Every structure is written in structure tokens, then in C-alpha cells.
């Protein structure tokens, strides 16, 4: 990349103006997106305007369209809803309203519009764009604008960001607000679970989603619900019978509660609505269970945005500004989407079309097609839900094959959800499943027992590791481990854990030369708060830790805002891996995040202090600095604290906080529960296939590299990679992968904290096409 290109980003917006508006229903994380659009816009040299109250503000103009400053978006990252207001607008649907809106934009020289809202809002924006030249002609004819103004504003660029808690927009894996809505729902389900267990009750929970069952579906996976009703997939005609049988079977197996999740738009095969009251009456009448209905309503839109939504909003906001400023009269209006963990640009109308196709397919009762059109992520969730909730657990003892499940390393939230799904999918496939306590140590000592269906009941929402986990590696106990593999007839091993699980896997591979017993398939599921396992972009537990850090930073920032002129230095966990410090820095709006992967010197520390001195002269009189625990052996948290205290004398005072082990605890977030459940199911499916493949002469013999894998999320898919192949990609001394995707997000953190840096624009998303993406072809 040339030096000139490097500097291009800083001057990309000179002479241009961007307006940002939020429209339709509010969603948590919209503020993060607005903040990013404003700050990155200003960084590129553009002028940025807030449009208050959505399209209504665009039509009314005047005070509703105000120029934004760097400081005007301060302290809004952690607020729910939308600070600039949103409104449903009838005027904008009429051409007359759009004419007034065009007039307001032209008069201010605004030719770039960033719309944050649902599919209705984005369709409105596209209509506005397609009529733009006609609207300008009319305004010129009426003498409202001059020919010169019309030429200056000859075309309108539009970029959409999807903000909707329902996740009902096709083309993006997640919309802004969905993850936070899931947080609210799961908090409530966890609270209801305790009261339901006390009274042996059945609860029917109604969640939002008139045309989309995403929230209901993911909630049911995240809390192990007995049944879910979603509009995309109505139940069979005899569902009443099936539901009641399922509820009574669960009770017979010793469960004290039943949970049924209903999307507000749930229907049966004939398109007749299924309401929560209908379900309650059915259960009471047929089974006589004490049943309660809870309608969650607008609680789901409220509260603080989750770390995921803040990062998503920020990334999307940056990408939106780049898309607007790079736009030409020929580029179609696009929407910035998320695919796996990649930001992509898709043509707005293609996405809107597919979204409409889903509704059409549902209206025409083509339900299988509706699920396919919803995309890969939705289909995966549906398949796993069907397996875990609707397949009857086998009654017979002694299965096809014997698979053992264990936890290795430090505890991470979501480990139990992974164990539960692994055990249950294993049982469904007819295997005998064993659980190993205390990691490789327990495997050597024979702390192994058989797990039945109800052994893992209610595990999804529990933090920590119920099996017990140790950091001990297998190398020194290979003999005892081999003996126990034979003794318990273990034919496959699922290892859920952190970097030790991965190195343990490598040691088992090495040990195969010495011990034939180790020639069994094994799979490592990455689970660690540090997110430092090679072969996966995410590991189970990191999202929960991130949210814990975020909540703490919010409270600390609040304290600093009250005291004024105070800088907090916060130490996060993660070993040598800077994932938590970087992502929490992005989500909490930190001024700097020190990490091992990006070496820093005393000069860098000095620059940061000078930066904070400048900041104290503005209206924002507080600072937040994150430091990864092992980022530098000499520049410790105490050293940085002392340096800041000395250099900031008379200007600001400093405080330090070491967050410590609270980052490993807590109830798992919806993301970690869902991710763990899917990973467990995927791993067990792979395992069953591998065992069959390795069956020779009456026994299992697996000695090929692909019989020992790490299951990881890579960009857009879950993939199995042999541990031996990942060896070259690993820095063993510092226990981190050599290449890490999230390092590309570091510049965003710095720009949003007002550092004058070069932004490499070569890595920005390119326009792709939604239909091609579906069929799995490469991006255009």
C-alpha cells in the first residue's frame, strides 16, 4: 500500500457533508453507530450533521438538523435507545414530504446520508435516492434552490445500517440491537427459572418478532426451552398432542419446570395465530400444570447495549463513512452487513428484496424456503434446536461408541453449555457418553463417569465449569491416560478448553507413536476468556468476559465523570493476548489500550499522557486506559499509574483498578450459550463420523493428522483444522496465534479516541451480492 493511499483517508471527506439519522423502532447500539459515524466523519475532514427524530426531522428541517461535534457524541456509547431520537414518519412517505427533505439537505450542502433503522426505513431511503434528480428539478423550477446548488448536490449517496432487535433483515448475520435484546430476554428467563423451579410451574414466555422468529429461536437454545413457536416454521397439525407429551416426559425425567417460548407472530400451518394464552389454556386443560404467561414487551428494547452491539455499531459506523465517501453516482445504495466476523457491503435493494421474499414465502405457506432465505445462521440454529428439543432421548443403555467429554484450562462461561450439547447430541446419536472430571488429571486418575440425558439438565445458563477443570497437560501421565482409555473403552475425546486444551491435543498426537491407545479421534472446542486458541476467531467465554469488563468500565467512567479530571487505568486478563483489552477498549470508549501484540515505548506512553492533558481542556474531563496484564514486563500497571500521576500533576489525578478473576465468572451471555451449544453439536457430529471412519478390524485406530482437530470459527464458517497444521501458526512462548484478525480493529479504537493516525483503507469491505453469498460462491 502506498504512502499516498495511507493519507487519503484523512482527506477523503474534505468539502463533503454527511447526515446521520435513526429511524423506525429504536435498538440498543444505535448510539455506538451514530458516535462512530460522527467521529470518523470528522476524522476524514467531513462535516457531520445529526438529524433529530428520524425522517420527520429531515422533512421539518430547521433545528432538527444540527451540526455534530466530537464532544457531542461523548458518553453516549453505553446508553440504550437512540440519543438523536426516532419517529415513525407519515410525511416522508408522500412525495411532498420528500421534496421538503431534499430542500433541507441541499441548502446545507449535504449529499451523504447514513440511515440507521429497519427494512422500512432503508427502503424509504432508497426511494428518496432514486427520485433525487427529479426532486432537485422540481425545487429548481419552484425557485427554491439555485442551479449552482443543484449542480453541487447532483447526486445523493446512501448507506444503511440495520438497527432492529428482531434480526429480521436478510444479508446480515446480526442487526444492531439483537444481541442486547437477547441479553434482556435471557436475564428474564434466568430469573423466571428460579421461581418456576420452586413451584414446579410451566412458563409461557412471549418475545418480540412479528415476522421473524430469531429472538425466540436463540432464546430457546440459550435456555434449553422445551418448545419454541416461530412464524417461519409452524408446528405439525398434531402439535397439541406432541407438546403435552413432551412436557410430561420432561417432568417424568425429574425436571421441576417447563419453559415454552413464543414469538408474537407465531402461527400454525394454516396461518392461524398461536397465542401464549392458547398455549397456557391447552397445558392447564390437558395436563393440569400450574402455568403462567409472561409477555416481555418493550423491556427487550431497553437497557444498556451489550459489548457485541457496541462493537458492531462502531465497526458498522466506520464502514458506513468509508462507503459514503468512496461512493460515486454509479454505486448503488448499500447496506453494511456482518457475515461471520467480516464487515461486508451489500446492495440495499437486493437485501430488501430477499427480506420481502421471506414474508411472501411465509404468506404462501412455503415455510422451508422461508427458513432457507433467512440465511445460514438461522438454519443452523433451527437444526440444532430440533435435535436438542424434539428428538426423544434413547432409552437403551450401552451405545454404539463411547465418547468422553472433558474441560481443560481455566474456567470460562459457556463451558457447561458446550458439555450439555455434546453429551445430549452424543446420546441422540446412540453413543455412550462419559464425562471426565478435572481435565487430563482426572483422565489419568480415572475420575470418569457415565452421563445420562438429565445429568446435564439446566447446565446451559450456568457459569464456570461444573465438571471441574485443571491446567495440567497430559504428557507426564500418558501411561495412566492410555490405561484408562482402554479400561473405559473410550473411542473418542471431546476436549473443551483454552490454550492448554490445544497443547494437550498436540501432546496426545505426539503420544500416539508410543501408545496405540491414543490413536482415537479427538476434537478441541476453544473455551477461554483470553480468546487465544489458534484456529478460531472466537472462543467460548470471551464474550461474557468482555461484557463483565464493559459493565465495570461504564461504572468507572461514571465515577470519573462525577469527580472530573480523573484518569482510570484498568488491567484486564488475557495472558499475552490483547483481545479483551482491545475489544473492551472499543466497547467502553477507552482512550488507549496497551497490548503485547503492539509493542509500545515510553514515548508512546508520553504521547498518551499529552493526549489526555489536551482532553482535559475540553468538556470531556475524564480518561479511561486499559492495559492487558502481560503487555510489557516493565511497564506494569503500577508503573503506568505512577507515570500518569506524575505527568498529570495539577491537570488530572489517576486511579488504578485490576479487574482480576471476576472476568472468568458470571452467567454466560446469550452469545456464549448459543455459540457453545452449536460448537458442541457440530463437534459431536464430526466425532461420530470420524469414529466410523477409523473402525478397522474390530477396533478404532485413528493415526492420521485429521483425526485430531480444533473446531473453530474462521471468518464465515465453522471449520475443523488438524492440530498439527496449526503448529506453525502458533507462538508457543506467548501462547497466542501468530495472526489475529481483531488487530485490524485497533486503528478504529484510536480514531474514535481522537488520535491523528493513518487509516489503512485497503482492507475495507467491497460490494458483494446477496444471492451469490447464499450459494457459497466467493465474494465478487
From Swiss-Prot:
- Chief location: cytoplasm
Which pathway does the database say it acts in?
A: Carbohydrate degradation; glycolysis; D-glyceraldehyde 3-phosphate and glycerone phosphate from D-glucose: step 3/4
- Which residues of this UniProt protein bind Mg(2+)? 119
| Reported regulation of activity | Allosterically activated by ADP, AMP, or fructose 2,6-bisphosphate, and allosterically inhibited by ATP or citrate.
Q: Where are the N6-(2-hydroxyisobutyryl)lysine modifications?
A: 557
Residue numbers of Phosphoserine PTMs: 133, 377, 667, 775
PTM annotation: GlcNAcylation decreases enzyme activity.
Enumerate the catalysed reactions.
Answer: beta-D-fructose 6-phosphate + ATP = beta-D-fructose 1,6-bisphosphate + ADP + H(+)
Residue numbers spanned by region N-terminal catalytic PFK domain 1: 2-390
Q: Where is the active site?
A: 166 (proton acceptor)
Modified residues annotated as N-acetylthreonine in this record = 2
The record lists ATP as bound by 25, 88-89, 118-121
Name the top EC class: transferase
Q: In which tissues is it expressed?
A: Isoform 1 is expressed in skeletal muscle (at protein level). Isoform 2 and isoform 3 are testis-specific and are detected in quiescent sperm (at protein level). They are first detected in the cytoplasm of round spermatids and subsequently in the flagellum of elongated spermatids extending into the seminiferous tubule lumen (at protein level). Isoform 2 is expressed at higher level than isoform 3 in testis.
Region annotation (Interdomain linker) ranges: 391-401
Under PANTHER family, the record lists:
ATP-DEPENDENT 6-PHOSPHOFRUCTOKINASE, MUSCLE TYPE, PHOSPHOFRUCTOKINASE
* HAMAP family, per database record: Phosphofructokinase_I_E (MF_03184)
| Function text | Catalyzes the phosphorylation of D-fructose 6-phosphate to fructose 1,6-bisphosphate by ATP, the first committing step of glycolysis.
Q: Which NCBIfam families match?
A: 6PF1K_euk
What is the name of the protein in this document?
ATP-dependent 6-phosphofructokinase, muscle type
Q: Which gene encodes it?
A: Pfkm
Amino acid at each position: 500500500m502506498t504512502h499516498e493511499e495511507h493519507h487519503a483517508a484523512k482527506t477523503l471527506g474534505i468539502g463533503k457533508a454527511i447526515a446521520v439519522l435513526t429511524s423506525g423502532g429504536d435498538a440498543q447500539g444505535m448510539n455506538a453507530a451514530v458516535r462512530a459515524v460522527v467521529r470518523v466523519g470528522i476524522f476524514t475532514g467531513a462535516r457531520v450533521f445529526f438529524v433529530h427524530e428520524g425522517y420527520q426531522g429531515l422533512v421539518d428541517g430547521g433545528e432538527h438538523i444540527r451540526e455534530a461535534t466530537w464532544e457531542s457524541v461523548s458518553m453516549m456509547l453505553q446508553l440504550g435507545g437512540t440519543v438523536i431520537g426516532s419517529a415513525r414518519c407519515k410525511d416522508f412517505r408522500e412525495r411532498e414530504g420528500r421534496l421538503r427533505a431534499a430542500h433541507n439537505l441541499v441548502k446545507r450542502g449535504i449529499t451523504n446520508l447514513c440511515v440507521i433503522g429497519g427494512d422500512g426505513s432503508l427502503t424509504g431511503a432508497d426511494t428518496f435516492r432514486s427520485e433525487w434528480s427529479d426532486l432537485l428539478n422540481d425545487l429548481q423550477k419552484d425557485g427554491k434552490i439555485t442551479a449552482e446548488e443543484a449542480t453541487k448536490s447532483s447526486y445523493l449517496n446512501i448507506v444503511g445500517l440495520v438497527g432492529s432487535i428482531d434480526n429480521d433483515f436478510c444479508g446480515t448475520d446480526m442487526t444492531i440491537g439483537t444481541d442486547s435484546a437477547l441479553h434482556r430476554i435471557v436475564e428474564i428467563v434466568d430469573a423466571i427459572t428460579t421461581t418456576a423451579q420452586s413451584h414446579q410451574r410451566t412458563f409461557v414466555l412471549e418475545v418480540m418478532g412479528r415476522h421473524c422468529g430469531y429472538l425466540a429461536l436463540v432464546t430457546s437454545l440459550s435456555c434449553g426451552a422445551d418448545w419454541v413457536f416461530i412464524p417461519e416454521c409452524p408446528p405439525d397439525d398434531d402439535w397439541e398432542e406432541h407438546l403435552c407429551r413432551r412436557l410430561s416426559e420432561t417432568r417424568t425425567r425429574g425436571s421441576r419446570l417447563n419453559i415454552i417460548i413464543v414469538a408474537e407472530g407465531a402461527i400454525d400451518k394454516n396461518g392461524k395465530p398461536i397465542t401464549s394464552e392458547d398455549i397456557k389454556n391447552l397445558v392447564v386443560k390437558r395436563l393440569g400444570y400450574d402455568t403462567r404467561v409472561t409477555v416481555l414487551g418493550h423491556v427487550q428494547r431497553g437497557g444498556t447495549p451489550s459489548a457485541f452491539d457496541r462493537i458492531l455499531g462502531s465497526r458498522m459506523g466506520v464502514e458506513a463513512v468509508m462507503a459514503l465517501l468512496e461512493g460515486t453516482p454509479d454505486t448503488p445504495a448499500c447496506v453494511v452487513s456482518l457475515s461471520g466476523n467480516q464487515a461486508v457491503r451489500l446492495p440495499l435493494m437486493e437485501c430488501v428484496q430477499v427480506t420481502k421474499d421471506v414474508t411472501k414465502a411465509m404468506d404462501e405457506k412455503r415455510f422451508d424456503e422461508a427458513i432457507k432465505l433467512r440465511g445460514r445462521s438461522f438454519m443452523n440454529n433451527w437444526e440444532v434446536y430440533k435435535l436438542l428439543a424434539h428428538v426423544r432421548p434413547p432409552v437403551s443403555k450401552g451405545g454404539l461408541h463411547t465418547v468422553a467429554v472433558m474441560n481443560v484450562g481455566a474456567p470460562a462461561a459457556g463451558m457447561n453449555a458446550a458439555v450439555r450439547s455434546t453429551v445430549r447430541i452424543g446420546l441422540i446419536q446412540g453413543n455412550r457418553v462419559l464425562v471426565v472430571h478435572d481435565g487430563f488429571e482426572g483422565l489419568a486418575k480415572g475420575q470418569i463417569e457415565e452421563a445420562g440425558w438429565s445429568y446435564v439438565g439446566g447446565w446451559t445458563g450456568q457459569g464456570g465449569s461444573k465438571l471441574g477443570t485443571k491446567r495440567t497437560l497430559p504428557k507426564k501421565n500418558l501411561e495412566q491416560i492410555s490405561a484408562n482409555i482402554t479400561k473405559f473403552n473410550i473411542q473418542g475425546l471431546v476436549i473443551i478448553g483454552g490454550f492448554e486444551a490445544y497443547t494437550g491435543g498436540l501432546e496426545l498426537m505426539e503420544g500416539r507413536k508410543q501408545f496405540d491407545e491414543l490413536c482415537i479421534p479427538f476434537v478441541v472446542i476453544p473455551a477461554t476468556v483470553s480468546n487465544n486458541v489458534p484456529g478460531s476467531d472466537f472462543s467460548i467465554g470471551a464474550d461474557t468476559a468482555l461484557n463483565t469488563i464493559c459493565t465495570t468500565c461504564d461504572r468507572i467512567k461514571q465515577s470519573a465523570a462525577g469527580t472530573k479530571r480523573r484518569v482510570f487505568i484498568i488491567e484486564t486478563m488475557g495472558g499475552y493476548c490483547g483481545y479483551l483489552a482491545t475489544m473492551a477498549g472499543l466497547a467502553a470508549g477507552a482512550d488507549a489500550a496497551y497490548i503485547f501484540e503492539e509493542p509500545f515505548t515510553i514515548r508512546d506512553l508520553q504521547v498518551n499522557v499529552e493526549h489526555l492533558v489536551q482532553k482535559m481542556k475540553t468538556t470531556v474531563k475524564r480518561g479511561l486506559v486499559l492495559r492487558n496484564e502481560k503487555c510489557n514486563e516493565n511497564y506494569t500497571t503500577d508503573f503506568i499509574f505512577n507515570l500518569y500521576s506524575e505527568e498529570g500533576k495539577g491537570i488530572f489525578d489517576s486511579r488504578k483498578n485490576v479487574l482480576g478473576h471476576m472476568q472468568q465468572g458470571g452467567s454466560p451471555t446469550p452469545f456464549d450459550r448459543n455459540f457453545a451449544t452449536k460448537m458442541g453439536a457440530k463437534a459431536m457430529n464430526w466425532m461420530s463420523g470420524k469414529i466410523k471412519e477409523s473402525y478397522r478390524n474390530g477396533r478404532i485406530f485413528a493415526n492420521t493428522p485429521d483425526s485430531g482437530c480444533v473446531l473453530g470459527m474462521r471468518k464465515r464458517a465453522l471449520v475443523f483444522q488438524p492440530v498439527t497444521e496449526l503448529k506453525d501458526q502458533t507462538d508457543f512462548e506467548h501462547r497466542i496465534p501468530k495472526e489475529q484478525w481483531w488487530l485490524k480493529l485497533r486503528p478504529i479504537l484510536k480514531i474514535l479516541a481522537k488520535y491523528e493516525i493513518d487509516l489503512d483503507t485497503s482492507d475495507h469491505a467491497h460490494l458483494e451480492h446477496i444471492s451469490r453469498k447464499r450459494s457459497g460462491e466467493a465474494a465478487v
